[in-house]
């Protein structure tokens, strides 16, 4: 029986410790995991864009691999008509409003979803705002099963077995 834990799937977990004991070079995750990166899209007035982006960056949005503060934005026209219970910051209740908005998209680690959503909720200027979160097919080079690396010198199978006995 082999019990696997989250530590088996981390770049700094059990497999990394084994690689370090064996003094392996050029180590990397053997089977990178999918579904650990999500994407947030929302729509915001251009005047509020930079503030919202910066707040979301501090919550973990906009990261992928070795990069942070990543986003994609495109301008468009948003329309809405608030009912009698609405509280629009732009436009009037009962009248259709057209406004230039920016569609902005961020990637983020799946485990930070609640933190990112809470930041969006607190900092989005609209009382009602549209957003979507989807899982991506990107693999995460730091999360996955197993690790692989290279030895300094080539060894026969018997030499390698003896090497493992000494190092472990």
Segments from the language model and where they lie:
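Hydrophobic structural segments
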Residues: 1-168
